């Protein structure tokens, strides 16, 4: 009897991977040039390939489910957040009893139980708390974050792990591909927030009245509140018709959009891990506002990119400018887009902190420097300033160039 059960289990496993094996064990016109069909590729995906999923929210739940069902067993999930009531309508791995618990831990526990053989591991912490050694162990990183700051930091971390040969060529073995997915600016989010959160708190008809998507007064109230929230967060296209559709579950756009984007990301992870098909080059947009529209294009790299360029970053500034002007430029300039930069320099061989907001005592001590002219602080044409920010794990060196001295060779 036991032998028969084992045979049945083995047969089920073979059938489970039957269609994936067709992709991995035979060639085709869209395969990567380095692809060699082999049954060992599936063994690598299942037993060796380590994938880090950053974020366990709407996208992260879908990614974890998709990758586990694709055969990836060595999955790690990192998320610092806990589960809230408003998450339950689109983050399907969570239940009402999970409210207040770790997203990463609950998601991993759910998938490990439902997908045989999955060995997912949860990390309930900020991504900044994990060191280089942690990130270096993964073959691929895929993220579903709603924070631009966190996405930029993660990109910077993976860039910092790159190694170079003696001839300054990139060591390809040090490259950890990043598949970056995101959904943002959806008007449905505003409606769902009012439906799940604000209705319970501000229901003008009393706590005993249930929200009715067929009641024009209820729909109008939700529509008005959703519009207010949309204006506050710079989101458009909240309409009465859309409000009614979301309330009656006719338009499950948030959940379906997350599922579609996660499926695209998971497919890219599979392609990177197996080389069974050329990977995307390199950016895809999906717009589901009016039907479904997708567009894939090659996003060009800036030659002076702050994250990956080896060129010296130069900031042009008036010599009578204040440190506040440099601070504002670092925050507002599209090249940098920093959040709270800390600025230091080296003067006469000694480190000097000009301004740093991340540490309260130093911020209080250096706050007055923001009002001072940069020349009064010892900065000169051609000087290097060192800038640290939450958007990058590394310090960035920037050379100041005084505008009135454009024809004068900068000091070295």
What are the residue ranges of the model-derived segments?
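Adenine nucleotide-associated cytosolic modules
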Residues: 1-412
């Amino acid at each position: 009897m036991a032998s028969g059960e084992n045979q049945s289990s083995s047969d089920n496993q073979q059938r489970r991977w039957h269609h994936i094996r067709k992709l991995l064990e035979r060639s085709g016109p869209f395969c990567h040039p380095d692809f060699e069909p082999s049954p060992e590729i599936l063994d690598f995906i299942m037993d060796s390939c380590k994938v880090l999923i950053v974020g366990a929210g709407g996208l992260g739940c879908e990614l974890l489910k998709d990758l586990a069902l694709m055969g990836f067993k060595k999955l790690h999930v990192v998320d610092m957040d806990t589960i809230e009531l408003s998450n339950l309508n689109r983050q399907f791995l969570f239940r009402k009893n999970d409210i207040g618990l770790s997203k990463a831990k609950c998601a991993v526990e759910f998938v490990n139980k439902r997908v045989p053989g999955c060995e997912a591991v949860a990390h309930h912490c900020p991504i900044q708390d994990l060191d280089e050694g942690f990130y270096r162990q993964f073959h691929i990183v895929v993220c579903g974050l709603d924070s631009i700051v966190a996405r930029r930091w993660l990109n910077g971390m993976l860039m910092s792990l790159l190694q170079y040969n003696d001839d300054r060529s990139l060591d390809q073995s040090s490259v950890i591909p990043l598949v970056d997915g995101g959904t943002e600016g959806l008007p449905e989010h505003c409606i769902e927030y009012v439906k799940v959160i604000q209705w319970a708190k501000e229901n003008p008809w009393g706590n005993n009245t249930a929200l009715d998507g067929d009641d024009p007064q209820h729909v109008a109230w939700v529509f008005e509140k959703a519009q207010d929230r949309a204006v506050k967060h710079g989101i458009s296209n909240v309409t009465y018709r859309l409000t009614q559709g979301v309330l009656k579950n006719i338009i499950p756009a948030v959940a379906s959009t997350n599922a579609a984007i996660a499926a695209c990301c998971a497919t890219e992870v599979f392609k990177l891990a197996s080389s069974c098909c050329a990977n995307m080059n390199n950016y895809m947009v999906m717009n589901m506002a009016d039907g479904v529209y997708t567009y894939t294009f090659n996003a060009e790299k800036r030659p002076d990119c702050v994250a990956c360029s080896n060129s010296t970053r130069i900031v042009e500034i008036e010599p009578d400018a204040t440190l506040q002007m440099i601070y504002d430029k670092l925050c507002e300039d599209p090249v940098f887009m920093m959040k709270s930069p800390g600025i230091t320099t080296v003067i006469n061989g000694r480190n000097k902190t000009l301004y740093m907001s991340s540490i309260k005592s130093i911020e209080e001590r250096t706050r007055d420097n923001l009002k001072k002219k940069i020349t009064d602080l010892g900065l000169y044409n051609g000087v290097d300033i060192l800038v640290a920010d939450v958007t990058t794990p590394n310090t960035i060196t920037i050379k100041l160039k005084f505008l009135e001295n454009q024809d004068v060779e900068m000091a070295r």
